[in-house]
Amino acid sequence: MELAHSLLLNEEASNQLGAVQKAEFIFEWLRYLEKLLLATNREDVREKQKTLVGQLLSLLNSSPGPPTRKLLAQDLAILYSVGDTVSVYETIDKCNDLIRSKDDSPSYLPTKLAAVVCLGSLYKKLGRILANGFTDTVVNILKAMKSAESQGRYEIMLSLQSILTGLGAAAAPCHRDVYKAARSCLTDRSMAVRCAAAKCLLELQNEAIFMWSTDVDSVATLCFKSFEGSNYDVRISVSKLLGTVLAKAVTAKHPGAGSKQSARRVSLEEVLELLGAGFLRGSSGFLRASGDMLKGNSSVSRDVRVGVTQAYVVFVSTLGGAWLEKNLAAFLSHILSLVSQSNPKATQTQIDAVCCRRCVSFILRATLGGLLGEKAQIAAAKEICQAVWRLKKVMDAALSDGNVETRLSSTDVAASQHVLVCALQELGNLIHNLGTTAAPLLQDSSTGLLDSVISVVLHPSISVRLAAAWCLHCIAVALPSYLTPLLDRCLERLAILKSSPEAVTGFSSAVAALLGSVTHCPLGIPHGKGKIIMTIAEDLLCSAAQNSRLSLQRTQAGWLLVAALMTLGPAVVSHHLTRVLLLWKCVFPASPRDLETEKSRGDSFTWQVTLEGRAGALCAVKSFISHCGDLLTEEVIQRLLPPLPCAVDLLTQLSSILKTYGSSLKTPSIVYRQRLYELLILLPPETYKGNLCVILKELAAELTAPDTQAAASTCLLPALCHPDDLLILSPLLQETDHRFIEEQLLLGNGVACGSLEYDPYSIYEKDVEGDSVPKPLPPALSVISSASKLFGVVCATVDEAQRVLILEQLLNSIKHTKGARQQTVQLHVVSAISNLLKYVAGSKQSLGPEVRRLVLTLVLGALESPTPLLRCAASEAWARLAQVADDGAFTAGLAQLSFDKLKSARDVVTRTGHSLALGSLHRYLGGIGPQHLSSCIGVLYTLSQDSTSPDVQTWALHSLSLTIDSAGALYHVHVESTLSLIVMLLLNVPPTHAQVHQSLGRCLNALITTLGPELQGSNTSVSALRTSCLLGCAVMQDHPGCLVQAQAISCLQQLHMFAPRHVNLSSLVSCLCVNLCSPYLLLRRAVLACLRQLVQREAAEVSEHAIMLARDGRDAAADANLREVGLEGALLALLDRETDESLCQDIRETLHHMLTSMAVGKLTLWLKLCKDVLAASADFTAVTCVDTMQEEEGDRGDDASVLTRGDDKPHPFSNPRWATRVFAADCVCRIINQCENANRAHFDIALAQEMKKRDSRNDFLVLHLADLIRMAFMAATDHSDQLRLSGLDTLLVVIRRFADIAEPEFPGHVILEQYQANVGAALRPAFTSETPPDITAKACQVCSAWIASGVVSDLSDLRRVHQLLVSSLTKIQAGKEALSQLYNESASTMEILAVLRAWAEVYIIAVQRHKNHKQALKTTVNSEDSMRNGSSSAAGLLDLVCTDLATLSKLWLAALQDFALLTLPAEFASQLPTEGGAFYTAETSKSAKLHYHDSWALILHAAALWLTSTGFADPDEGGANLSRPVTPTSMCQGSSSSGAAVKSPEDVYTDRFHLILGISVEFLCSLRSDASLESIMACLRALQALLDVPWPRWRIGSDQDLGIELLNVLHRVILTRESPAIQLASLEVVRQIICAAQEHVKEKRRSAEVDDGASEKETLPEFGEGKDTGGLVPGKSLVFATLELCVCILVRQLPELNPKLAGSPGGKASKPKTLLEEGSRLVAAALAILAELPAVCSPEGSISILPTVLYLTIGVLRETAVKLPGGQLSCTVTASLQTLKGILTSPMARAEKSHEAWTSLLQSALATVLDCWSPVDGAQEPDEVSLLTAVTVFILSTSPEVTTVPCLQNRCIEKFKAALESKDSVVQMKTCQLLHSIFQYPKPAVSYPYIYSLASSIVEKLQDIARRKPEDATELQLCQEGIKLLEALVAIAEEEHRAQLVACLLPILISFLLDENALGSATSVTRSLHDFALHSLMQIGPRYSSVFKRVMASSPALKARLEAAVKGNQESVRVDPPSKHAKNLARNSSIQLKTNFL
């Protein structure tokens, strides 16, 4: 193929190829040429133009296929536009000659067609350059058309369209000729020709004024004729033509009088009348022929009506939303008049009426629902409301008129009913779509919307009553706050008007519809409504027999209410189940004998009532089983079963009842049968086992009954066909935007579409996806559907013999019927058989050989049926039969049977049926073995090339695609030949056969999937395959059919998945963007599915290509939004107007992927998009309020720019719907989350501003804070409740992410501070009385987050938001009864708990701040101002909360008590309070539990803090209220009047203690994987707070089992949660438990001492763990549990501490390591706990644990003793030294019973520390300073007998000596500091050996430094520490030795002095040393004056030096204290001050 990539065709290469390859080669060359010509230099093209034209014309003569000729024509046109146009006329003449040729042979046809296409392309591209001779060309083409076949006519029409496009107004001379030709083609028998003619006329009307002026009526009539017998594509094309022409007629500015063309003005009324005439009378009506309009007797065919319906939509869409707003009244009036009494012909039969109503609803939905913004929709709803009122008044006047002559007849009532049905359905749809934004509409008293809808609930027509009920359903779904009031109103009217038949039917339907809406309203309805409804239903059923006029209505209404009640689910129904089952039992006779008696009584009417009642009962039970599965226990099933046999018996008697009482019972009997079948389908077959044979016979009779309708196929069969197979059938079976109206064309003209009045029970069922109003089919069709489904179940359950009998019966029925009747029976039987096979396969059963034979015979007959849908269903059954048989031989036999049929048959029916059967076999059995695969492919190859029948080709290719899919790797050997076949067909099949191209596309897709990743290969064969795939895609992309283009995109998507490098992303994205707004739903879906895949990997590239396409502007078809807002904005705009849910989901996912990949990089673009969407509708006063607030804040540079944006530019998003705005708000949150994982500067304004200055392209989120706040504000204050929730969510995210960011311009402040007013304004509306609870709950969360964030420090500002919480608290104090009764009780629970949770969060933060403030007061000294501000803020917040704390504490404890009850296991359910808890009712406990789970943790923490603050004693409380479970009556009131025993305060405290502890332990015990970090932390902090107070500590300390249990729970938490925060908090609780135990032990010891007297101390019992034996029992010991937990923490951080690991090979040589900060803190906390343990033990017990504690402490020291700069000690070393000191100073070390053992163990420990110096196996040497410090701690903290043992003491001295001789000055210095402490130790036995051994070394060290002078600060510090050490020695020396020491010290000090000269030039180090030495001398002189004088006298040199120094430093001498610098040095160098463990 590379040879094809040249400017001239490589003829040599192409001639060497076979026919198929040559066609491919030429096509590839033409594709390449198209791109090359546009990119090549004009001169180079002209140079080779002549040759190129010759080559192209030669190809023209070689019979090119359709895609090739199209590409050839384009290339020729581009060539002339780029090169010279000199020879263009010559080329045109050649084309004309080819067209004139008399050769009519089929082989010459492609050449003629190619010439036609070339002419069109040349004129389109070159336009007016060719204007001279175009008339000849047009005349020639039109002449050729007269003898052309359909393909020729098709191409000629498209060619004329191209000529008109190119020439524009210059083509005027030929306009009439073209118009005439196109007129005839518009009614052509070929649908493709009609489409082409419509396109041609659409182009013509741009310039031909007569089309939309003088000839407008004839154009309309022509279009109406074109609709007759049309297909979907024709209706789309022609309706576009008609709608556009009429829109032009209305809006066009007509030329003046001087114009040559006379033009007639056409008014809107005329245009609407014209369309109306077409709708009502088809093509027989004319604009001016009013007489003819009155005659129209014949019914208009449905396809004309559907076409006109689409034309209406195109007409209004072309004029646009703004036009519709202006002309709304006229338009609405006209559309509704189409089904009014002024046009009775349209609705003369029920079938016609239903179809017309559908069309009118579609027009209204597509225009009012699709084109208008929310404001205009509200106006439209008002207009509809007025129409309803007008009709209602007319109806009322007519019905109340006493004059019989003037009263409306029943036909008039029937006529007006259809207008009302359409109006009410559209009103419901509008409100449903508006959601809560429709609130102003319902509140507008002048409109009276609710009154008008409720008033028509009493309309005489059942259709209107049901439509009104459905409208109420829509209102309730849209505005949940209206649900309960509407329900109350309808129930009230039902109770009052129960003697009116219309009222009973109407209001029961309304109640049922409202109950159906409850599932869509998360807040629900009050639980008590169920009881009221059940009572009314019972009353209706019981009173039905009292009044025969109302019997039927009351019976229907009663059961409808019961059935609808079931949708409320088990929680409600469980309370009424007994009553329902009783009603069910009573409705059927108790025995067969009673049924027989019944038959002999009554009349037609009583039987009608009976059947309706029983059908209703069956429906109610079906509803119960569907919606209350949880209640379907074995016991309930047993109670349901008794009436079933009787119900089945009645089924068998129906035919005789019908004979007896007449045909009036026909419909009730059908409905009864349908209801019974539906119920039996839901029940397990075992439950009606005894009746199976009877049921089966009845079903067989039902399926073969003589009066069944023929049109059931379209209802029954699609569900039984595979969805993929439906694509090859009628396009009507595919999903389209027009499905709602196109559906009716599937049914025959004699069959009605679905409509609500056919089954009133469907009014409460869940909405069918994508449909607004339920559309149940007529009972006659529905019963067949149910019967065939039940047949599958029953036939699979009966025994084999019974099956054989029934199947033979069915087979005979088919044989004994003829014609259409036979088809109908066959259809029913096949659907039943399909259901049987489906059920058998699903239940893994099998069929016997005889049954298989019979099934095969039945299916084989259907496989050759003339009905395509039946053939399709039969092929599915064929494959399922093989699947069920699961027998290779049987399957092979089936395949062989099809092969034989295909080889012999020549008719289309057999060939299509059996080819699909082969494909289905492959699909279900994964291929039928390699031996059959080749035969199958061979047969399908042959069939797919049968050009005489496009149907055969389509089915065969579809079957081939199934074969490829299922064969998998086995197919690889056939890939090349199949691909060659596909490409050959793609290049040759005419474009008019779009269905063949679609099947080819599916084959190509299957091939690409089979090849998979192999397509990435680089070898020649793979490259050739890939090129062929791409070529195939290119052919399909260029096909005019949208569904073929969808296949092309799908193939390219697959190719991109497997070989992304080889797919041209630019052209693919271009193709996707162009088709983004295609009128074809399946194409839009393919586009979005592909885009979604692309952006997952290459979002930025896709976005860039889209922008390039928009800039290029060559493709006008690309969405205009692309130019303004890029692909992202175009997708958002598409999301706003798209109605298909799966497509919307794809759009959302695509945008999410793009946002994830690009939001951080394109921050401004994304935020602007979101802001534009949110601001486009923010036209409420609230928004202006933000702007004024912002203006007061002054200029803030970049941030504020958005707030002052002028709105002079038009919005790219006009009136976006609320759902789009919610999505935009969600995107804002996602953007913030994305930025969190990106650059730190996104949340640091100073850094962001600095980086922005550095590079202006940098963009950071923090710079857009004003935008974020504004967007959150706009959303939070919208009319839409969903958007308000999203806005509050966004605000919450903004507060949490930005609260801590400091304001660089105002230190001490944060950037969010300036938005206080905005936050307050956004929150305030959420606290009004009419706000739904979910919004208030979310607002409470935002309030608490705002207060807790610390943004606001000023109390007056804080009080504004605080006041909102106060108002909520006041509201909930009244308890659950007083809260809103609009919603379910669980909604009140949610609101109450949200308020309490918010207060809890605020209280927790207030206490925390107060605590921090108090600590700050202790530790720091701040300036007076900052102290004052901080204290006022910290204390002020606490004071604000404390005002309400008395109330809050009670509510918190009540909520916790509720939570504790709700979390009890199920076995305690019987013990729960029957009335529920404080904040929930027993009935709603299940749903309430979820709300408690969200809130309990913070409430628990707050309650624990409150109890801590009161010390468990509430000063305001008598101790009686909260000692027992809080009930609604006692929650906030005084003591109960029941006389219950008053508990003591002690009991109250105990209850509270156990409540807090119990909830905490229960939660921590069984932590679920989804338990949040916040909940666990809150729980642990609650325990910490609890244990901060003495009384709870005493409880824990005195109950050892409780302490152990709590420790075990904490141990589990530490094991299961890795979070350091959780582990630290757990350790803090452990520490508190140990402290509690210590306190308890101390108290017991003190008590014992006091009680027994001090004199008897020796005989005191031992307290503490271990008692006298020292034994610690695991599971019974608090200390042991603590040790386990601490070991767990330490070993996790330092695995080397594990004794097993330490003993393993290589385990000993470990390198000391530094832990991370979190790990260090954990280790320190564990060590601190270890230090406390000995105090909890008895002396013997302490001996037991001491080795472990010492091992762990010294282990930590050893493993973490890492050298740090400056001799610092690591955090863990410091902790281990502190622990060591705590242990060494423990009283147990001195206790008589343990002293000896402790001494021995401590000596061992010291020896272990000393051993640490000896590294094992080359491990790194540990830090000497750390180990020396540990040794020093031992020397100073233990009794002398531990450390004065010679062997230990000598080793210690050696270590110090070695350290003094270290080369590291820091080590020497630190050693001097440690020795300073030892030398001063008061006991000589300890200190003297060190002085004797080390003093001389120190003196030598100082003398050495004195000689060479210190060089740096470290040596200076060493020198100073050495001098201090000698000074200390002087101080402690005995008098007789002191002189010697002073004499030794003075020369050293004096040697450091500098004289006056040297002082000036001294370094800072020598100067500091001079000052230090001089200061020391000044102190020693007076203190030891005699020695001082003696030394001075004996050494004149020293004296002279001293004097010189003093003289040179007189200033220093005069100042008594040393310099500040020296002071600091002295302070810094003392380790005692740094760490306090010595």
Swiss-Prot record:
Residues with the Phosphoserine modification: S1647
InterPro entries noted in UniProt: ARM-like, ARM-type_fold, Laa1/Sip1/HEATR5, Laa1/Sip1/HEATR5-like_HEAT
Name assigned to this protein: HEAT repeat-containing protein 5A
Region called Disordered, residue ranges: 1646-1668
Gene3D superfamilies, per the entry: Leucine-rich Repeat Variant
Biological source species: Mus musculus (Mouse)
Keywords, alphabetical: Phosphoprotein, Repeat
Repeat (HEAT) residue spans along the chain: 850-887, 1082-1119
Alphabetical list of PANTHER family matching this protein: HEAT REPEAT-CONTAINING PROTEIN 5A, HYPOTHETICAL HEAT DOMAIN-CONTAINING
Chain ranges passing through the membrane: none
Family designation: Belongs to the HEATR5 family.
Domain of life per record: Eukaryota
Pfam families reported for this sequence: HEAT_HEATR5A, Laa1_Sip1_HTR5
